[in-house]
Amino acid sequence: MNIKIITVGKLKEKYLKAGIAEYAKRLSKFCKFEIIEVSDEKAPESLSEAEMTTVKDKEGERILAKVKDKEHVIVLAIHGKQRASEEFAKEIQDLATYGTSDITFIIGGSLGTSDAVNKRANDALSFGKLTLPHQLMRLVLTEQIYRAFMINQGSPYHK
């Protein structure tokens, strides 16, 4: 199985890099895992709706350029479906069981994802109504993917 996270912007925080590296190392026993960063669009502090759409569209083009046709795409979005860790684990297992070998998660920029990205997605996942930095979501998502594999293995990691 191949699992990819496509995310907007460069990760600078060392503590987040260290956490992600640890979970990526653990995930290597279960899947090929990679994170692809696409550049974020520079934007002033206050944007009109049209300017926000333009920023999301430009970032969306960069994201979609990294997505292959055969990939099952899950976008992280506030409007997405919230799942318990066990449900998330079952969905990953079911995708693998029924022939999906490439899963791509998308974390948009600070303004979210474009309509084109949302339309390309096969599913939308939400971690709740909280607003979290998209850089932090990389670590949270990577840990949850690892947790899903551990749940599917029957490991005591998930208590």
Swiss-Prot record:
Binding positions for S-adenosyl-L-methionine per the UniProt entry: 76, 108, 127-132
Keyword rRNA processing: yes
Keyword Methyltransferase: yes
Entry-linked Pfam families: SPOUT_MTase (PF02590)
Compartment(s): Cytoplasm
GO cellular component: cytoplasm
EC code: 2.1.1.177
Molecular function GO terms recorded: rRNA (pseudouridine-N3-)-methyltransferase activity
CDD domains cross-referenced by the UniProt entry: RlmH-like
Keywords of the record: Cytoplasm, Methyltransferase, rRNA processing, S-adenosyl-L-methionine, Transferase
Catalysed reactions, as listed in the record: pseudouridine(1915) in 23S rRNA + S-adenosyl-L-methionine = N(3)-methylpseudouridine(1915) in 23S rRNA + S-adenosyl-L-homocysteine + H(+)
UniProt xrefs under Gene3D superfamilies: 3.40.1280.10
Quaternary structure note: Homodimer.
Role of this protein: Specifically methylates the pseudouridine at position 1915 (m3Psi1915) in 23S rRNA.
Similarity field: Belongs to the RNA methyltransferase RlmH family.
Name by which UniProt lists this protein: Ribosomal RNA large subunit methyltransferase H
Gene: rlmH
